[in-house]
Amino acid sequence: SVTVVIEPDGFLPDGILSPFIYYLGYESGKALYFNQVAVPEFWEIAGNNQFAHILEDSRERGVIHYVDAPQARLVKQVDWKDLSGRIYQADHYNRYGACFAKTTYSADGQAILTKYQDAKGQEIVLENHVTGDILLTLPGQALRHFKNRVEFTIFFLQDLGIDTRHLL
């Protein structure tokens, strides 16, 4: 039997699949340690066991969120902030140390778009959080459009040949 989750999580255990992660094809690498996050020159990272701050002079320009094992200080997400302290983008990391997705936020803090990219940096999945639409671009195939996560997940299950008659 196969376990499938709809949420895109870069740290899913072996044997658990997500349609958002599956098509990206990441297979090797090590999770990123908090002080390995790329930051502009002269910015610094200050971390503790709960999270880390990215600082420009003394201004917070980002927050690094760890995976659920906080002692490890492995990067799950980086929220980037503008000069007013508003989050404008979140970078999502996987257990291979790669930034596999980027979410863009509106001025009022609402998620607008998430772009999922493969190991080569090619955009594979685009999720519009405003409309719910999802676009899937696979190499050598026509662009596929889904109205929502349910349609996308059904396609994923069919694409893998998973029997959908016994879903929980």
What is the role of each PLM region?
Residues G15-V63:
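Extended, small-residue-rich solenoid/repeat segments and analogous flexible loops
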